Amino acid sequence: MKGTLILSNKLNIQIVTDKSKWDKRYLALAKEISTWSKDPSSQIGAVAIGSKGEVLAQGYNGFPRGIKDLQDRYNDKDRKYELVVHAEMNVIYNATYNGVCLNGATLYVYGLPVCSDCAKGVIQVGIKKVVMLKQDVPLKWEKSWQKTKEMFNEAGIKWDFCSES
């Protein structure tokens, strides 16, 4: 069956013909994770999914472990940018913290496309595909997004946009 994804386990076999259905589900999970961010201006979420559909790690934009999520730090943009860890990097850090390998995983990102700094991390840990919410890229992130696309293409990382509905 060309174009059909078969997911199996010991109990049953499930034939999935609409891969985008799973992309939308995992993107919805990334959206839920984005709500965990305490940043009042940007809520980004990401989740890494393994080859069998298992959740490997998740992350949202926020401060590192042990750094207090004080509202005045979020309100001061310069201070916030010094402290904040992007959702994509939090996925990588959380996986590392828990001893989980992301090699071959798919990363789902809700909120903004992957920036060029996070793209470096995605490439380095062996993530093979990135799916992001279909949207217009904000002007201030356009240059970074262009660099991300160049790096992903050169490194052989598949990337795509997916709508929510």
Regions found by a protein language model. Give the residues of each.
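Zinc-dependent deaminase catalytic domain
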Residues: 1-165
